[in-house]
Amino acid sequence: MAFKVVVSDTKTGKSYQFETESTALIGKKIGDEISGSVVELEGYKLKITGGSDKCGFAMRHDIHGAMKMRVLLKEGPGYNVKEKGLRRRKSLRGNTISKDVTLINTKVVEYGSAPLGGEPESTE
C-alpha cells in the first residue's frame, strides 16, 4: 500500500508531493506530528491535517476511528453549505489513517537543514 503525502510549506505557500510505502503512518490521527524521515525529509517535523481514501472520501477530524460513515453535516470539512440552515448527509472517513487511505495532507511544523523542494531545476 502506497501513500501519497502532500507536504505544505507554510512559509512559501507551496506544496510538494511524495510517495511512501511506510507502514509507520497507519494508526496516526489528524493533528498528530510525525517525523519527516517517513518521506525522506530529514530533520523536518510534519503535522497531519487531513487526507482522503481510495474512493475519494475526505477524512474529518471529529469522526473518531478509521471507518467510513454517513454523517449529518451543517458546516465544516467535507461539506460546502449552499443555503443558510441547510443540512446534508455525507459519506466521510474517520480521523485515523488506515490501509484504505491513499492521500495524506501535512504541513511543516519544524524545518530541517536541507531545502524542502530539493535542487531547483535549471531552465535551459
From Swiss-Prot:
Gene Ontology terms describing biological process: translation
Q: Which InterPro entries does this chain map to?
A: Ribosomal_eS6, Ribosomal_eS6_arc
One of the Pfam families matching this protein, by short name: Ribosomal_S6e
NCBIfam families cross-referenced by the UniProt entry:
PRK04290.1-3
Q: Which UniProt keywords apply?
A: Ribonucleoprotein, Ribosomal protein
How is this protein named in the record?
A: Small ribosomal subunit protein eS6
Work out whether the entry's keyword set contains Nucleus.
no
